[in-house]
Amino acid sequence: MGKEEISTTKYLIHAQINANGIVEKPDVVGAIFGQTEGLLSNDLDLREFQKTGRIGRIKVNITSRGGKSKGEIIIPSSLDRVETAILAASLETINRVGPCEAYIQVTKVEDVRAVKRKRVVERAKEIYASMMEEVTPESLKMIEEVKEAMRVHEITEYGEEKLPAGPNVETSDAILVVEGRSDVLNLLKYGIKNAIAVEGVSVPKTVADLTRKKTVTAFVDGDRGGELILKELLQVGEIDYVTRAPKGKEVEDLEKDEIMMALRNKVPVEQFYHDLGMKKEKKKTEDKMVLLRNILKELEGTGNAEILDDALNILREVKVENLYDELSRVNNHPYAVVFDGVITQRLVDLSFEKGLRYLVAVRSGDIVKKPHNLKLITGHT
């Protein structure tokens, strides 16, 4: 086939031919045109397709032995997928070639463009590899120094304790809590900008407060130190997910694929407790929920609302109609709101902004968007 055919061909029809007699290429080509003529509509006429260049020159490789012939037929096609399939199927209706009985079977229809794409990918790999070979160790060192400088430039200090953190910790709804500065730097290296470090086994107040406002994944080392930090986090903070570096490895040493695998394999904290056979500290949470329900019973029928801290002490007591405005003005870390009224989407959104963990009311309206770390409790649930 010519250069023009190669450039426009979309598919190659491959077929196997067997004939009970000695036949040659012109016989096969003649049979293809002769026996498919009139078989289909004029729109699918093989001769017309070849005249207009929509199929290329038919290639036939055939050999004869022992009074029988066997070979391969290849037909280039620039038709669409459906037309090519119909053309391929029509070949199998041919039952004679010249004076001989014959049988044709389509073995495959090859997508030429897919083959070209594969070649492009393979060649691109080769070119890239050769480019990398030309990069000198000095150049690699220089590149790494620039990358390291950029990572250090991106790292920030967060909270009163000036904890090492990525630039997105403040604005992101979800954060990663890691052990140290090196962990944050390594995550920045791979574009993860919402990590904050505890910088030791003791969990800082800033991190504990963040766990009440955001969806938090604890990402710790796969060693004893990681276990200790995780236990402290689970006691002091409100962790949503847990993941660990592979056993014996530290987060600061992980490659990109190891980090992504660990984050994909994170588990809800409830499952973490269950999988490790650890005792989950449910009692404290369950006791709080009982107390919150009791407070709701006391408030029913009063038209009042109470804004509470994490010890369930009253920060502010207001009328329900003033609740939204009063909650907007509260800045000393409200933990829960209990009120004699109906939970609305507007109030849910504000509660999430304020970092509340519980919103308790007589009943709930139609809530379309419920934050993961805000629990809604009503008198009917």
UniProtKB/Swiss-Prot annotation:
- Might you report a single GO cellular component term? exosome (RNase complex)
**Which family is this sequence assigned to?**
Belongs to the archaeal DnaG primase family.
Free-text cofactor note: Binds two Mg(2+) per subunit.
Could you tell me which species this protein originates from? Methanothermobacter thermautotrophicus (strain ATCC 29096 / DSM 1053 / JCM 10044 / NBRC 100330 / Delta H) (Methanobacterium thermoautotrophicum)
One Gene Ontology molecular-function label: metal ion binding
Entry keyword set: DNA replication, DNA-directed RNA polymerase, Exosome, Magnesium, Metal-binding, Nucleotidyltransferase, Primosome, Transcription, Transferase
Q: What is the protein name stated in its UniProt record? A: DNA primase DnaG
What lineage does the source organism belong to? Archaea, Methanobacteriati, Methanobacteriota, Methanomada group, Methanobacteria
Q: Which residues form the Toprim domain?
A: 173-259
Q: Which GO terms describe its biological process?
A: DNA replication, synthesis of primer
Q: Kindly list the cofactors needed.
A: Mg(2+)
Tell me, in a sentence or two, what this protein's role is: RNA polymerase that catalyzes the synthesis of short RNA molecules used as primers for DNA polymerase during DNA replication. Also part of the exosome, which is a complex involved in RNA degradation. Acts as a poly(A)-binding protein that enhances the interaction between heteromeric, adenine-rich transcripts and the exosome.
Quote the subunit structure annotation: Forms a ternary complex with MCM helicase and DNA. Component of the archaeal exosome complex.
Binding of Mg(2+) 1 occurs at 179, 221
Q: Broadest EC class?
A: transferase
